Regions:
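Compositionally biased, low-complexity flexible segments
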Residues: 24-32
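A conserved mid-domain beta-alpha-beta active-site/ligand-binding segment of alpha/beta enzyme cores
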Residues: 233-264
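Catalytic alpha-helical scaffold of carbohydrate-active enzymes acting on polysaccharides/glycoconjugates
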Residues: 4-11, 16-19, 31-187, 191-230, ...
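Active-site clefts of carbohydrate-active enzymes
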Residues: 237-239, 280-283
Length: 328
């Protein structure tokens, strides 16, 4: 896989994105738009609509009901929970299952109401089965004008799948989401780990952007077997999942970190394109003790004059239009 990124500067020196020793032997830069007038304008910071300094992406993960469970034939229950209890036996963790369902029953109404109140159009990264089992939520997402991005058929790992199984997993997710929501998903987010085939399969199945990357603050092209896809990097450091994986992290600390991230990127965006991703979960941020931290972050974003709040598909399309690839 060959990647293309817009040029960037740090101080007066132009630096490479990666060290020469990290480049695979025999690799060459794929022909692209890094020398076009559009790319030069992008590098000067005029990439986003209305001269915005920052593209802000809100990502709401919908995984509830699609997680691991012996009920679904899995060998173990879901290992990710608020208490850090990971059972190794093939028995259902009914307590954790109910904790996940909280996201649908109580968390979702809070999150949806907050997004509506502040006029936020988000990207909902949804495991297809989760939406199948929560049709009212699926309808609310569509009615709110949000984007639905595929987050797997179920919220399970795909890194151990062979190519045929992974292709079927991707196809089933896309077909299910389109049936449930009426929207064909154009983006994909794996359950963290993916395979060397994933990006090629996504291209072949008609996806236009991929989120499984954490290497930059702007999108970039990846080229696989001569075909291109936009990579829209995600972020884990500001994700509300940190309040589950690090239970001592308070909502106030999470909020402070998120705001600091926003401020640095917003200031950098005055001279170069920048994007911020904030990922949240219905069952986590939707809790009464956490929802106001999310609200305060949204209020902070809304208080800044030059922010473009957009779905990830909009960001991918805008970046691709401003930084077109040239075929060899």
């Amino acid at each position: 896989m060959l990647t293309e990124r817009g040029s960037w500067k740090f101080g007066a020196d132009t630096l490479p994105w990666r060290l020469a020793k990290d480049k695979p032997a025999g690799a060459r830069r794929a022909p692209g738009g890094t020398d076009t007038p559009e790319a030069r304008r992008m590098a000067q910071g005029s990439m986003w609509p209305d001269n915005a300094q920052l593209a802000m992406s809100f990502v709401v993960n919908v995984e509830e009901g699609a997680e691991y469970s012996p009920r679904e034939g899995d060998r173990h229950p879901e290992p990710v929970d608020e208490l850090g209890i990971a059972l190794k036996r093939p028995v259902r963790n009914l307590g954790n299952e109910s904790s996940y369902l909280y996201g649908v029953h109580a968390g979702a109404p809070r999150v949806m109401a907050l997004l509506e109140r502040y006029g936020i159009r988000a990207t909902f990264t949804a495991a297809a089965v989760a939406l199948e089992r929560a049709p009212e939520l699926a309808r609310a997402i569509v009615a709110g004008g949000h984007e639905v991005c595929a987050h797997g058929y179920r919220w399970i790992h795909q890194f151990s799948m062979d190519e045929a199984a992974e292709r079927e997993f991707i196809r089933k997710a896309a077909a299910s989401i389109e049936t449930t929501t009426g929207q064909r998903p154009y983006g994909w987010l794996s359950r963290y780990l993916f395979t060397e085939h994933t990006r090629r399969l996504l291209i072949e199945e008609g996806f236009t952007y991929h989120m499984d990357d954490y290497s930059d603050d702007v999108p970039f092209w990846d080229v696989v077997d001569g075909r291109a896809i936009v990579v829209v990097p995600y972020a884990l450091d500001s994700n509300d999942m940190k309040m589950w994986t690090a239970p001592a992290l308070t909502p106030e600390q999470w909020l402070a970190y998120a705001i600091e991230t926003f401020q640095v990127l917003y200031e950098e965006g005055a001279t170069r394109p920048r994007m911020m991703s904030l990922g949240v979960h219905l069952r986590i941020i939707g809790r009464p003790g956490r929802i106001r931290a999310f609200q305060r972050f949204v209020q902070h974003v809304r208080s800044q004059p030059r922010v473009w709040i957009a779905t990830r598909r909009e960001i991918a399309e805008r970046w691709a239009a401003a930084n077109p690839r040239r075929l060899a």
